[in-house]
């Protein structure tokens, strides 16, 4: 019962956190607000204690969030920026683990080399969800954000695999060699991607089977879609490959396989709204859980530091700043090196980095905030070695990782708005132009289809449709489509006409809705009739509002 009440409290806090953020006299990013609320609830005054199980956390929260990110990731842009993404998600992770690992070993007393590599490994993954939370959607230029999102999708796996190697060496269950580690990583990565593809393909086949035998029942199909990331993750982990990459691959496969395109309309509409709600709750839970762990981490670490002769308490805090500064320096240096390398050796087909200014490199550097994967990874480090001794400096690893997470978020909140001032984010006029061209092209195809259908119906004696009525209806529909097709030639007039028509339609829909409630209040229609007609109006209004965004 206690677990049930804890889940209810956390869900309530997540739902109210957005409201609290908006009514605050000063602006606080939602992730920081949720972390602060979590820390406040875990303080002894309130005493909300939630036991953090890293393995359960990785299974419960990470697969659906990464699946959703993979689902939303534009596959074309991801493939176009493949060199940039893998340069950050693989090469930079290796550089970070080695470089920062040696730095921690040299400057932080009491942390041996292998645990230092473990800490560097958990600090290597970046968090695109936290980044969007602290700067807002659409604030970072698209050419930068696309690469950062792809990096965050991939470096979770490379960072956790590096952590796995470091812990295995520290536990004495593995002898590290560069060749062995490379082969193991390739096996884990490629196997995870293949597992995600296969599970997603099986999901598509099962949907077609269910539609054939059980009808288009959206509830069943959405539940199966919700289970898909968990199935991908668990199956991949069971066979010894990357569950994280499997969840990402499953999400990206959904967009390319045509599963959603062939799905029934009701399923697509409900799936989108359901996933939007789940993303909000799960993202909020992640940051709330991070906040709930902070008081315990702080108390445990300070108590352990007091009895550790090699550590001064003030050194723990200065080491956080030092490690974060080193992470930023390595990241900036790597991006700068990639820029110079691209301009020098890849002149025929340069990487995106080649066109970045120093300011854009700084944005990408400070955008490398740390988040949930880092916390889950460091807390998954075992308490004891196989011989029963305590894992070396574990409390320092946990404290430093948590500190770097918070410090990276705070620095991002301060620096990114400054760097993003007066920067060109996206060419909205170009996007509107593309949308108008696409709508005009589809309208022309639709006109041809209607003309063919009109000819077929006129020739079909079994339809028994009056020719005058057939011509009148088809002409009306074709006329609406023709205006859309001609709109690309007079863009300004077309935009004004569309906006005016949308305003008229919205006004009409809202008056219809008010009248339906009046008819139900006067008992002229039943509640069932009201709900059916309201559903139709809601779909039309959602379409009109979506077009305006």
UniProtKB/Swiss-Prot annotation:
Query: Does this UniProt record's set of keywords contain Chloroplast?
Result: no
**Predominant location:** membrane
Give the GO molecular function terms: potassium:proton antiporter activity; sodium:proton antiporter activity
Keywords, comma-separated and alphabetical: Antiport, Cell inner membrane, Cell membrane, Ion transport, Membrane, Sodium, Sodium transport, Transmembrane, Transmembrane helix, Transport
How this chain sits in the membrane, per its record, is: Multi-pass membrane protein
GO aspect biological process, one term: sodium ion import across plasma membrane
Among the Pfam families in the record, one is Na_H_Exchanger
Span-the-membrane segments of this chain are 1-21, 28-48, 50-70, 85-105, 106-126, 165-185, 187-207, 222-242, 278-298, 310-330, 361-381, 398-418
Gene Ontology cellular component list: plasma membrane
Specify the domain of life of the species encoding this protein. Answer: Bacteria
KW RNA-binding (keyword) present: no
Q: Can you say where in the cell this protein is located?
A: Cell inner membrane
- Say which family it is in: Belongs to the monovalent cation:proton antiporter 1 (CPA1) transporter (TC 2.A.36) family.
User: Which PANTHER family does the protein's record reference?
Assistant: SODIUM/HYDROGEN EXCHANGER (PTHR10110), SODIUM_HYDROGEN EXCHANGER 7 (PTHR10110:SF86)
Q: Report the protein name in the record.
A: Uncharacterized Na(+)/H(+) exchanger YjcE
Gene symbol?
A: yjcE
